[in-house]
């Protein structure tokens, strides 16, 4: 026990001062580690190379997948709330998704401590595995409206994952539901847009911009839709920053070498920067 006179408050016993009455016996109770299943989580890192730096590479990607799991949890629920017209909860969930993207943006700085020399040591052990094959990331893209049936192919060897992604492909996106909600409130969205195949993905449609323009020109009248539009812009803004930081991190580590999954690496990632999730919301800013 530390003899320092400042180590305990007046009137406390030595035991109380040291442990602050914290529970210490978990023989018949659930502990922190039990609740979080830390035995499983912390036993899921299996480096294939002898290199010290591979642990960083694994944990960077595993933690990203955990954040994406939470993102999907929020996006699925937000989509259902938008579908039912309950925008209050949806706005909170979308704000949380934006903050998750911010968290992932900052996380790239940790991976960026890996040098090209260090990465080249572990690269031969990675085979063809690549973040391009992340099924959670693919579902996030599908929920946000960036859909392409070709991207189901990397998951054909996992029947349960393929089925889940096929369902996500054919389910209306979050943005589809926002557009339907505008139409339900009497805003001028074309029937062609409302009847469009959900698997086709988002593309610009003039009537949707016209509807959003009415929302922005009368925010007091359409306050909930106005707030929804701004939350969608926040989300895509954060998503774009995450993508840009991804490109920069990959370029500083591997340069312009091909990616492990067979893509052009940085060239492929740069092409993804041109993807626009909610095109009408961006274009109307030039036309207000």
UniProtKB/Swiss-Prot annotation:
Keywords: Dioxygenase, Heme, Iron, Metal-binding, Oxidoreductase, Tryptophan catabolism. It is an enzyme of class 1 (oxidoreductase). It holds the Pfam family Trp_dioxygenase. Its cofactor is heme. GO terms for biological process: L-tryptophan catabolic process to acetyl-CoA; L-tryptophan catabolic process to kynurenine. Pathway: Amino-acid degradation; L-tryptophan degradation via kynurenine pathway; L-kynurenine from L-tryptophan: step 1/2. Belongs to the tryptophan 2,3-dioxygenase family. This is Tryptophan 2,3-dioxygenase. It comes from Pseudomonas aeruginosa (strain ATCC 15692 / DSM 22644 / CIP 104116 / JCM 14847 / LMG 12228 / 1C / PRS 101 / PAO1). The lineage of its organism: Bacteria, Pseudomonadati, Pseudomonadota, Gammaproteobacteria, Pseudomonadales.
